[in-house]
Amino acid sequence: MASGTTTTAVKIGIIGGTGLDDPEILEGRTEKYVDTPFGKPSDALILGKIKNVDCVLLARHGRQHTIMPSKVNYQANIWALKEEGCTHVIVTTACGSLREEIQPGDIVIIDQFIDRTTMRPQSFYDGSHSCARGVCHIPMAEPFCPKTREVLIETAKKLGLRCHSKGTMVTIEGPRFSSRAESFMFRTWGADVINMTTVPEVVLAKEAGICYASIAMATDYDCWKEHEEAVSVDRVLKTLKENANKAKSLLLTTIPQIGSTEWSETLHNLKNMAQFSVLLPRH
């Protein structure tokens, strides 16, 4: 991993999921309420620093957790972070494990997704906003930023965390949990973990030309595992409370590493990909 003097300034957006959105991780915090062409984001942006790296924290479900997954304004959230100058977005998300080896309390640095959502806008280029003209066909073969993932994986190893270096996330619409038949089906599809928020967040970040990576915290075994209690809200919150410090320490240690790494080529490539994926109207 290259380090040294950075020629490209970075700013890290942090989207905190259920139980993983503690603003105390930021030094010198200030709040900023913003609006976007797509409406208001989930909550105020919390601006601050982590070891001299500029960061912007946003609670995905609102600070009081009042927004269900289907109603999160993913477009506004990503747009607001982009407008604030974020080059990277690192998110935390609770998830269910679909694999024996991914135990509750483990971290997964996911590298792929399967989309089972049905109600969510997945593009800024929806034809109704002058700020995003045209139609965007963004490539998603590699949805998550490999370089950011590598920094997260290396840091997790140094911290001695139980961390899985890859995994496929299936995102369901929610807010209900899966039936047992669905849970079995997702396992046969090759999914490793399950949540309700990765899509469309990762897609919109790619359209915005942002380096996006996700820290997924396994809280349960969903409902496929025999002789194991099925997922419930109480169980998810209990596991998060016991293990949230792992995600916190990973963020606090990773972000200075990102701040000392050269990103100009990565960001240039992402910007070009986003730009050249848009088909503009013919005149």
From Swiss-Prot:
Name the UniProt key words of this record, in alphabetical order: Acetylation, Cytoplasm, Glycosyltransferase, Nucleus, Purine salvage, Transferase
Compartments it resides in = Cytoplasm; Nucleus
Main location group:
cytoplasm
Keyword check for Membrane:
no
The entry's cellular-component GO terms read:
cytosol; extracellular exosome; nucleoplasm
Any one GO molecular-function label of the UniProt entry: 1,4-alpha-oligoglucan phosphorylase activity
The record, for CDD domains, names: MTAP_SsMTAPII_like_MTIP
How is expression of this protein distributed across tissues? Ubiquitously expressed.
Activity modulation comment: Inhibited by 5'-methylthiotubercin and 5'-chloroformycin.
Sites of the modification N6-acetyllysine?
K51
> What is its biological role?
Catalyzes the reversible phosphorylation of S-methyl-5'-thioadenosine (MTA) to adenine and 5-methylthioribose-1-phosphate. Involved in the breakdown of MTA, a major by-product of polyamine biosynthesis. Responsible for the first step in the methionine salvage pathway after MTA has been generated from S-adenosylmethionine. Has broad substrate specificity with 6-aminopurine nucleosides as preferred substrates.
Quaternary assembly: Homotrimer.
Q: What is this protein called?
A: S-methyl-5'-thioadenosine phosphorylase
**From what organism does this protein derive?**
Homo sapiens (Human)
Lineage of source species:
Eukaryota, Metazoa, Chordata, Craniata, Vertebrata
